[in-house]
């Protein structure tokens, strides 16, 4: 795992972590762009991947991100999504021979939110996307922050980053909300895997976020290439090399199924 730097949309130098398979590979390889969730750093997000890049011969780039005003709390800022779309070029500049037909996005929570926004805004970039327990409605997130231990602090950060409350700047919250882009996500043609939990204690009613997004996609766009998995796991717990992440990657051909461990004992269900 190597620390690199890239230039964000606002000109700031930001770190990213690059994971590569070992040894010489004489062909272009797939690249996974992995934005981090709100409660962790880019390095912590990179550590979730374990040895999977080596097992599947693909690279992962995990950028720190950069919002409108804040760094680690980008919450789907338009500039941040533009930066994510540039990650294949960043990886190439740092020696990765990227196969442009095999670029994927994988993220959890805020990273899942940004993964979905990337699908909506730059669909031609991606061969597939995976979102674990994503935030899909930023205005609801702002209101629901109150129920969290550090909720008032998170609301203050959101006002700084987004420019006010949902009542003051509703369009700014909408443009950071995947549920505002249902048609674009469906029309993108990007194969999409969504994972959400009925016992999430961070996004406490995922039925009204990811669940609602799924219902709209299936109702209005039944032809969308969509896999949905529902379980009872802790928030983003399944986005790990030891949990459901390998199965999600194998579904897109990034890992051999023979290398995928058995499902955890408390298996979820397919919706």
Locate each region found by the language model.
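N-terminal cap/lid segment of alpha/beta-hydrolase-fold proteins
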Residues: 1-24
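Short substrate-entry loop that stabilizes the transition state in hydrolases
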Residues: 24-29, 34-73, 202
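Cell-envelope and extracellular/periplasmic
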Residues: 36-38, 134, 162, 195-200
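Mobile cap/lid helix-loop segments that gate and shape the active-site cleft of serine hydrolases
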Residues: 39, 44, 140-184
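Alpha/beta-hydrolase active-site loop
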Residues: 75-96
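Primarily recognizes the serine-hydrolase "nucleophile elbow" in alpha/beta-hydrolase
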Residues: 101-148
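Short, proline-enriched alpha-helix->beta-strand connector loops that line the catalytic pocket
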Residues: 185-192
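C-terminal catalytic histidine-bearing segment of alpha/beta-hydrolase fold enzymes
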Residues: 193-195, 202, 206-271
């Amino acid at each position: 795992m190597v620390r690199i730097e890239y230039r964000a949309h606002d000109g700031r130098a930001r770190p990213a972590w690059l994971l590569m398979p070992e040894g010489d590979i004489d062909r272009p390889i797939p690249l996974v762009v992995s934005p981090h969730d709100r409660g962790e750093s880019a390095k912590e997000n990179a550590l979730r991947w374990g040895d999977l890049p080596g097992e599947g011969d693909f690279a992962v780039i995990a950028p720190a991100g950069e919002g409108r005003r804040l760094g680690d709390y980008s919450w789907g800022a338009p500039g941040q999504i533009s930066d994510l779309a540039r990650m294949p070029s960043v990886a190439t500049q740092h020696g990765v021979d990227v196969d442009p037909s095999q670029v994927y996005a994988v993220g959890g929570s805020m990273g899942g939110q940004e993964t979905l926004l990337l699908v909506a805004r730059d669909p031609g970039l991606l061969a597939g996307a995976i979102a674990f327990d994503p935030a899909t409605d930023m205005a609801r997130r702002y209101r629901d922050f109150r129920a969290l231990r550090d909720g008032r602090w998170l609301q203050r950060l959101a006002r700084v980053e987004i420019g006010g409350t949902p009542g003051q700047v509703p369009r700014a919250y909408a443009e950071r909300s995947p549920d505002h882009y249902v048609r674009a996500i469906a029309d993108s043609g990007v194969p999409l895997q969504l994972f959400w939990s009925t016992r999430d204690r961070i996004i406490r009613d995922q039925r009204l976020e990811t669940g609602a997004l799924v219902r709209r996609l299936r109702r209005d766009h039944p032809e969308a290439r969509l896999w949905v998995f529902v379980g009872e796991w802790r928030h983003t717990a399944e986005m790990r090399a030891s949990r459901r992440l390998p199965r999600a990657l194998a579904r897109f051909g990034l890992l051999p199924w023979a290398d995928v461990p058995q499902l955890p004992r408390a298996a979820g269900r397919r919706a």
